[in-house]
From Swiss-Prot:
Residues 83-209, 243-376 form the C2 domain. GO terms for molecular function: metal ion binding. This is Double C2-like domain-containing protein gamma. Keywords: Calcium, Metal-binding, Repeat. Ca(2+) 1 binds at residues 274, 280, 334, 336. The keyword Calcium applies. SUPFAM superfamilies: C2 domain (Calcium/lipid-binding domain, CaLB) (SSF49562). The gene is Doc2g. It comes from the Eukaryota. The lineage of its organism: Eukaryota, Metazoa, Chordata, Craniata, Vertebrata. It comes from Mus musculus.
Length: 387
């Protein structure tokens, strides 16, 4: 049995509808007909929306009380990358001195996991590459979410080839040691492809920090480097090549002393050989073939570092024509107490070398009293002695 429609073209109104009141802003007043606010449905028929009244549409609209709209959240707050804050810094590729300078200025709007103040520092890494070999950091600024560092971090031995293939990663980290907290992930990080840099021209950045994307370190890398306990934290799974590091050597033929001065200045980005992620490096020098004079030297050991500075100089007596027929073998080792030292990398300078190694050797012996400093990439195999 069909339900009868409302008489006189009007819908029936229930007692609940009569008891409704208007809660819009302004004086409280009852609602005469709630159907004017909501569609009216009959209990036994298909829901039918009320047809619009054409005359009411043509009549002038009665202004109603203004409705309060919720304030939309700032656009940046809805994005995780911009909610972590921003970092201001400047990069300068000093091509003449083979150096990359990164000046960390300040951070703004940091969002630490815990309430209150935070102690922060900036950590830098060159990717791809060994994590600790290229890791630099600023000092810690305490008790603020708007830290100002104004500190410059310098990567030595940085070349145009590095600028074309490497990326600089900057992380804003909380120094949990000062507050005896458990070390957590960085507050935010960013990455800058260094191919964008113009040599000898500073460039400033103000970039939003992002969440760090972490994966487990490949076990093959740890095993190959003897690094089974290298890092407990998760690091980037960027498989870098077998780059063993670089060494800065200076050569000068002294006409006054009648011999070759070899300076071992520094090494950078050495391969870690110890379980703690570092090495105890030193450098060995050998002039081959030996003429019975002093031909072997070695530097002192630098403890627990992958970027050692030596600044030590050694002398090989001999005429330029005699030295031109010889080869200088330079090797970097990791010192181990009680066991055999581990080979890190080496380089050979001679008339039979090629590239920068050959140029370094020829220019040194071709010009007296001319000191020439050049960076050399270390080979992963020990230098071979010729006949």
């Amino acid at each position: 049995m069909a339900c009868a429609g409302p008489a006189s073209g009007r819908h029936g109104v229930s007692m609940q509808e009569h008891m409704a009141i208007d809660v819009s802003p302004g004086p409280i007043r009852p609602i005469r007909l709630i159907s004017n606010y909501f569609p009216h449905f009959y209990p036994f028929l298909e829901p039918v929306l009320r047809a619009p009244d054409r005359q009411a549409m043509l009549a002038p609209a009665i202004p109603s009380a203004p409705q309060l709209q919720p304030n939309p959240e700032p656009e940046g707050d809805s994005d995780d990358s911009t909610a972590l804050g921003t970092l201001e810094f400047t990069l300068l590729f000093d091509e003449d001195n083979s150096a990359l300078h990164c000046t960390a200025h300040r951070a703004k709007g940091l969002k630490p996991p815990a309430a209150g103040s935070v102690d922060t520092y900036v950590k830098a890494n060159l990717l791809p590459g060994a994590s600790k070999a290229s890791q630099l950091r600023t000092r810690t600024v305490r008790g603020t979410r708007e830290p100002v560092w104004e500190e410059t971090l310098t990567y030595h031995g940085f070349t145009c080839q590095d600028a074309g293939r490497k990326t600089l990663r900057l992380c804003v980290c909380e120094d949990s040691r000062l507050r005896r907290r458990r070390r957590g992930p960085p507050l935010g990080e960013l990455r800058v492809p260094l191919r964008k840099l113009v040599p000898n021209r500073a460039r400033s950045f103000d970039i939003c920090l992002e969440k760090r994307k972490l994966t487990k370190r490949p076990k093959s890398l740890d095993t190959a480097r003897g690094m089974s306990l290298y890092e407990e934290e998760e690091v980037e799974a960027e498989v870098f090549g077998e780059e063993r590091g670089r060494i800065l050597l200076s050569l000068c033929y002294s006409s006054e002393r009648g011999g070759l001065l070899v300076g071992v200045l520094r090494c950078v980005h050495l391969a870690p050989m110890d379980a703690n992620g570092y090495s105890d490096p030193f450098v060995r020098l050998f002039l081959h073939p030996s003429s019975g004079k002093k031909s072997k030297y070695k530097t002192s050991v630098r403890r627990k570092t992958l970027n050692p500075e030596f600044n030590e100089e050694f002398f090989y007596a001999g005429h330029r024509e005699e030295l031109a027929q010889k080869a200088l073998l330079v090797s970097v080792w990791d010192y181990d107490l009680g066991t055999a030292d581990d080979f890190i990398g080496g380089v050979q300078l001679s008339g039979r070398a090629s590239g920068e190694r050959l140029r370094h050797w020829r220019e040194c012996l071709g010009h007296c009293d001319h000191r020439l400093e050049l960076w050399h990439l270390l080979d992963s195999v020990p230098p071979q002695l010729g006949d």
